[in-house]
């Protein structure tokens, strides 16, 4: 049984396949079509030291769909706690209130440190620029469901590859499967070299127009304004990394566009109605995947 | 007869073949600080047939534990240890890098939880050695560091 879920690197291919298979079994429940109360009497503690809407809500939905309860600490409450209490103490206290903790924290490694101080399982919901393993699992689940397989996929990762924790987690997991990976980003936001070195997969930098007709998945991330020294530079870069329905004209029919959301303007609304858009489906898949993780650590 | 740069010790630990210029870092790793009661002698840039130049540290009256001594391999993988009893070498060995070190290195990532003030946390690193060069990876944030001399806390 999985004790904590801190980094995608803690899981092997077999663990991932197991969680994805379990998630599939929960899909009817996630949609509310079937009732299942296997976590009745259990309490999940949501500790969000940084704002989050969808991750926090989808954990809450996952827990409630399985009959469990949730207690929440929001970023606002966290900031008042932070004035006087260490993370170690907060975790020691809250782990006495619940059966598992979900944590999002601005510092890298905070989830691992939380796990070391917790008497209940800890699930990492994002620690700074570090890891976001539940997002990675739902991304893999989306690829598997929508493309029918994980092995043999050609995927392009596009946008902010330097700071995006989603990308850093995802690329490690993609390397466990037989995938060809293209990296599409402005030079200033390229994937850090040490991550490329660590990943034993076929990886190549490319431009979208070179690979659009070849790829099975286009994974887009937000380019954050605050990463740029001036707004002019940001506008130049972000403008060239914007997907429209037109951009996708030469894509394969089966090619899917994914995005961890929220999007700003990197995917034009015209893409939403194309056969390629899967980002809303992807965010729904967060529920069955998180149900699988919660049931795994709590039962 | 060659003159000894540092006098012989009766009992204690001699750390030889330290990379030239690293003796002070060795003391730091062993947590021997100003104000110590120990008798410590140190020689820097001593001519060496094998290494060209080397440093030597002698700590009198104390047998330092192997796991502490092995941490020296992080900055000086060729270092040798002589444990001296009654002016004779009782045991001699080469340091070998530990797989995990706690509380020796400091993570350069300011956003790493191991640098958070007031948290009861000890930095922890996993060590990898290739061709006599050690690199380390932070247990908490995963940051990989080379040239470990720069990160001794």
Swiss-Prot record, chain A:
Keyword Kinase: no
Protein name: Aspartate carbamoyltransferase catalytic subunit
Keyword Lipid biosynthesis found: no
Pfam families for this protein: OTCace, OTCace_N
Organism of origin: Archaeoglobus fulgidus (strain ATCC 49558 / DSM 4304 / JCM 9628 / NBRC 100126 / VC-16)
PROSITE patterns, alphabetized: CARBAMOYLTRANSFERASE
Annotated function: Catalyzes the condensation of carbamoyl phosphate and aspartate to form carbamoyl aspartate and inorganic phosphate, the committed step in the de novo pyrimidine nucleotide biosynthesis pathway.
GO BP term, pick one: 'de novo' pyrimidine nucleobase biosynthetic process
Enzyme class per UniProt: transferase
Domain of life: Archaea
Binding-site residues for L-aspartate, renumbered to this chain: 83, 165, 222
Catalytic activity of the protein: carbamoyl phosphate + L-aspartate = N-carbamoyl-L-aspartate + phosphate + H(+)
InterPro entries: Asp/Orn_carbamoyltranf_P-bd (IPR006132), Asp/Orn_carbamoylTrfase (IPR006130), Asp/Orn_carbamoylTrfase_sf (IPR036901), Asp_carbamoyltransf (IPR002082), Asp_carbamoyltransf_Asp/Orn-bd (IPR006131)
Similarity remark: Belongs to the aspartate/ornithine carbamoyltransferase superfamily. ATCase family.
GO molecular function: amino acid binding; aspartate carbamoyltransferase activity
Biological pathway: Pyrimidine metabolism; UMP biosynthesis via de novo pathway; (S)-dihydroorotate from bicarbonate: step 2/3
EC number: 2.1.3.2
Cross-referenced PANTHER family: ASPARTATE CARBAMOYLTRANSFERASE, ORNITHINE CARBAMOYLTRANSFERASE, MITOCHONDRIAL
Binding site for carbamoyl phosphate: 54-55, 104, 132, 135, 261-262
Subunit structure, interactors included: Heterooligomer of catalytic and regulatory chains.
Secretion signal span: none
From Swiss-Prot, chain B:
Transmembrane spans: none
InterPro entries: Asp_carbamoyltransf_reg_N, Asp_carbamoylTrfase_reg, Asp_carbamoyltrfase_reg_C, Asp_carbatrfase_reg_C_sf, Asp_carbatrfase_reg_N_sf
Residues reported in the UniProt entry to bind Zn(2+): 107, 112, 138, 141
Cellular component, GO annotation: aspartate carbamoyltransferase complex
One Pfam family of this chain: PyrI_C
UniProt entry keywords in alphabetical sequence: Metal-binding, Pyrimidine biosynthesis, Zinc
GO molecular-function terms, A-Z: metal ion binding
Superkingdom to which the source organism belongs: Archaea
Cofactor note: Binds 1 zinc ion per subunit.
SUPFAM superfamilies reported in the protein's UniProt record: Aspartate carbamoyltransferase, Regulatory-chain, C-terminal domain, Aspartate carbamoyltransferase, Regulatory-chain, N-terminal domain
GO biological process, one term: 'de novo' pyrimidine nucleobase biosynthetic process
Assembly and interaction partners: Contains catalytic and regulatory chains.
Function comment: Involved in allosteric regulation of aspartate carbamoyltransferase.
UniProt family annotation: Belongs to the PyrI family.
Protein name (database record): Aspartate carbamoyltransferase regulatory chain
Gene source species: Archaeoglobus fulgidus (strain ATCC 49558 / DSM 4304 / JCM 9628 / NBRC 100126 / VC-16)
Highest classification ranks of the organism: Archaea, Methanobacteriati, Methanobacteriota, Archaeoglobi, Archaeoglobales
């Amino acid at each position: 049984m999985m004790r904590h879920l801190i980094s995608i690197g803690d899981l092997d291919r077999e663990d991932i396949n197991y969680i994805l298979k379990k998630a599939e079994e929960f899909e009817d429940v996630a949609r509310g079509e079937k009732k299942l109360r296997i976590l009745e009497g259990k309490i999940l503690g949501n500790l969000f030291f940084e704002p989050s809407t969808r991750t926090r809500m989808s954990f809450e939905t996952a827990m409630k769909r399985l009959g469990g309860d949730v207690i929440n600490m929001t970023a606002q409450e966290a900031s008042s706690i932070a004035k006087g209490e260490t993370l170690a103490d907060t975790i020691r206290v809250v782990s006495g209130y619940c059966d598992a903790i979900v944590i999002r924290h601005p510092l890298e490694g905070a989830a691992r440190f939380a796990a070391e101080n917790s008497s209940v399982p800890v699930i990492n919901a994002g620690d700074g620029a570090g890891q976001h393993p539940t997002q990675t699992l739902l991304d893999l689940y989306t690829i598997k469901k929508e493309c029918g397989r994980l092995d043999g996929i050609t995927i392009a990762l596009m946008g902010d590859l330097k700071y995006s924790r989603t990308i850093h987690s995802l690329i490690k997991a993609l390397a466990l499967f037989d995938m060809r990976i293209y990296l599409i980003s402005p030079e200033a936001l390229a994937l850090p070299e040490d991550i490329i070195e660590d990943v034993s997969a076929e990886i190549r930098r490319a431009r979208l127009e070179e690979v659009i007709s070849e790829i099975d998945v286009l994974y887009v991330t937000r380019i954050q304004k605050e990463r740029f020294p001036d707004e002019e530079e940001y506008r130049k870069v972000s403008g060239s990394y914007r997907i429209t329905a037109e951009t996708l004209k030469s894509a394969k029919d089966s090619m899917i566009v994914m995005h961890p959301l929220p999007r700003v303007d990197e995917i034009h609304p015209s893409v939403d109605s194309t056969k390629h858009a899967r980002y809303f489906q992807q965010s729904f898949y967060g529920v069955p995947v998180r149900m699988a993780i919660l049931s795994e650590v709590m039962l | 007869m060659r003159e000894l740069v540092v006098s012989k010790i009766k009992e204690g630990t001699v750390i030889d073949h330290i990379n030239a210029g690293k003796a002070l870092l060795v003391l730091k790793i062993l947590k021997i600080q100003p104000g110590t009661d120990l008798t410590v002698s140190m020689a820097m840039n001593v001519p060496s047939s094998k290494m060209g130049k080397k440093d030597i540290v002698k700590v009198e009256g104390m047998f330092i534990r192997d796991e502490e001594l092995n941490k020296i391999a992080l900055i000086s993988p060729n270092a040798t240890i002589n444990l001296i009893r009654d002016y004779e070498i009782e045991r001699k060995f080469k340091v070998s890098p530990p797989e995990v070190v706690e509380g020796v290195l400091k993570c350069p990532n300011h956003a790493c939880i191991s640098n958070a003030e007031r948290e009861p946390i000890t930095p922890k690193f996993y060590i990898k050695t290739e061709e006599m060069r050690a690199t380390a990876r932070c247990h908490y944030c995963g940051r990989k560091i080379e040239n470990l001399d720069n990160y001794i806390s």
